[in-house]
């Protein structure tokens, strides 16, 4: 499958806002490079580790009207006559090769390993999740994914039900099933995420215990013992009524995709219904966990 790449030059002061806007108007991924083409891997909105002169690189579906994208950028003053930009078609294989070369087995917590299928398993006796997430979905290399995996490893999931809200590659739901959960549900807005999650679940022998739904198609009465959502602070606050209602009485909630500077506002949204644990931080990111109050 081909993608369309838009590459435009920016300053580090503007690059973050441009990145966020590109995602709003349909970019499936955004990366940053300096003038020497040194990448920052797996950025999320809010990253600040940029260079003085930064190239913003966005991938769009091949059917995207790029002239419309350019017009939208111009209307927001993200693109003017002095801004250099380039549009070209990119094949998946160019990106997948770079990703595969840099993806190694990783350990999370005491029991859990995430292993690319093309590499040797470091510990045959551990709980191993074999992962082929494909382009633009999580692999565990970002601090937020790592925080979520470590939290799941710390729980006794034996016989429990789990919901992975914003499942992406399915990495969290699959890890929960391998860690002993009875069943899991993955929810996402992207059909490609649903497909990637199913393929990864099948590869790990847990597909029969994993249900997958697009957000608008999930059952209205859906609930689980453990709910985990690794998305972003804005959606976590906006979707509080939906996410909180997915948790069974006395159930556990895990939230990430949150910058440390955003933790207080997310806690404020959830603390009325949940008894929250101390916040766990890594680099610029954090994880918020808690248990649904019995009086709710």
From Swiss-Prot:
Disulphide bridges: none
Reactions catalysed according to its record: L-lysyl-[protein] + 3 S-adenosyl-L-methionine = N(6),N(6),N(6)-trimethyl-L-lysyl-[protein] + 3 S-adenosyl-L-homocysteine + 3 H(+)
Superkingdom of the organism of origin: Bacteria
GO biological process entries: methylation
GO function term, MF aspect, one: protein-lysine N-methyltransferase activity
SUPFAM superfamilies according to UniProt: S-adenosyl-L-methionine-dependent methyltransferases
Protein keywords: Cytoplasm, Methyltransferase, S-adenosyl-L-methionine, Transferase
Family matches, as Pfam families: PrmA
Family assignment from sequence similarity: Belongs to the methyltransferase superfamily. PrmA family.
Known function: Methylates ribosomal protein L11.
Protein name, entry field: Ribosomal protein L11 methyltransferase
Originating organism: Histophilus somni (strain 2336)
The encoding gene: prmA
